[in-house]
Amino acid sequence: MLFRSSEIYSKKILYSVVGLVVIANVINIGADIAAVGAALNLLFPVPILLASTIFTLVVLFLEIAIGYHAYAKFLKFLALSLLAYVITAIIVHPNWGEVFRSLVVPQITWEANYWYVIVALLGTTISPYMFFWQATEEVEEQKYASKMGLPRRTLRTIRRDNTIGMTISQLGSVFMIITTAVVLNQNGLKEIGSAADAARALEPLVQGFPNAGTYAKILFAIGIIGMGLLGIPVLAGSVSYAISDTRTWRQGLDYKFSQAKQFYAVIILATAAGWLLNIIGVDPIHALIFAAVINGLVSIPLVFLIFKLSSDSRVMGVHTSGPLSKTMLLLTFVVTLACGAILGFSLLSA
C-alpha cells in the first residue's frame, strides 16, 4: 500500500510517514526493553541493564534463527497472565457505578500531566506501527494460505477478526486501569515509580498465599516478559516493513535471513537502537509513558493519511471506505489532533 501510494502522492509524504514511524518505534523498543529489564530484575538479582541486554539478544536470536511466527503462537499464552487484572478487578469490588460514570463523564482538568496521560492513552490505542504490521501480516497470511491450499480470508473475515481482537484488547486495557487505580489508591500509592509498584496492583489476587507480594511480582513479570517477546519483534518488524516498502526490498518474516538480508538488517538495527537508549539510563516507567505519548502524536498525521488513502479509489480500487468508516476515521483524527494541541498549549503555559 505504501509503495502504491508513493506512485500517486508525493514521495516526501511517504518518507515523512516512514520517518515518524521509525522514530516512534525505536523509542517504543527502547522503552519495552527497559520494562522487561525491570521485570526480570523483580525475579532475579541482576542489574536492569544486564537483564535488558540479555533479553535483547534473546529476542534477536528467536526472531532470526527460530522465526517469529514459529514461537509467537506459543508466547500468546503468556499474555493470558494479563487476565489476572480482570480477576483482580472483580475481587477488589470497586464502586462500579462510579467506574462507569467516570468512563462516560470523565473529570477533565487542564493540567499538562492530565493531557500527557490522555495522549499516552491514545498512543497505546491507536498504535502507528500497527498500520504497517497489520496490513503486511494479512498479506503474508494470504500467501501462507495459498501455499497450504487453504481458503483465502475475505475482507469480512479480516474485519471480524480485527473487531474481536480490538474489543478484547480494549477491555483488557480498561480492566488494567481500573484494577491499578483501585488497588494502588487503597494503599496510598498515587504514582507508579517502579515495576515493583506496578506489580502491587495484583497483590489482592494472591493475598491468601504466603509472600503474596512475591507472587504478584512473578505474575506481573511473566506478563511483561511475554508481551515484550511478542511486541518488540512487531515494533522492529514494522520499521523494516516500512523501510523495505520504500526500497522495494524482499520482505517478510517467513523468509530466512539469507533470503532477506536487508529486511533483517533493519530489524537488527532498530532493535539495537532501542537497546542503546537504555545506556543513558532511562526510567522504565517514564520511558513507557513517553513512548506512548510519541505514539499518540505520531498517530495524528498517520490517521489523516489513512483517511485519504482509504477514500482514494486509485489506491483502494473498489474497496474504498464506506461512510461509517470515513466518519470514524475523521472523528479519530479530530480527537487526537485536539488532545495533542491541548497538550502542547498546556506544556507551553505551564
Annotate each PLM feature.
Residues 11-12, 49-53, 164, 168, ...:
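Loop-to-transmembrane helix boundary motifs in multi-pass membrane proteins
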Residues 12-67, 123-127, 226-231:
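Helix-loop-helix module between adjacent transmembrane segments
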Residues 16-19, 43-65, 81-85, 89-90, ...:
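Transmembrane alpha-helical segments of multi-pass small-molecule transport proteins
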Residues 54-55, 63-93, 294-299, 321-325, ...:
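Membrane-interface loop-to-helix entry segments
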Residues 74-77, 245, 251-268, 284, ...:
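C-terminal membrane-solvent junction of multi-pass transporters and transport-like membrane proteins
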Residues 80-107, 123-138, 305-314, 339-350:
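Hydrophobic alpha-helical segments and their helix-loop junctions in multi-pass secondary transporters
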Residues 136, 140-143, 167-197:
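Extracellular/periplasmic helix-exit of transmembrane alpha-helices
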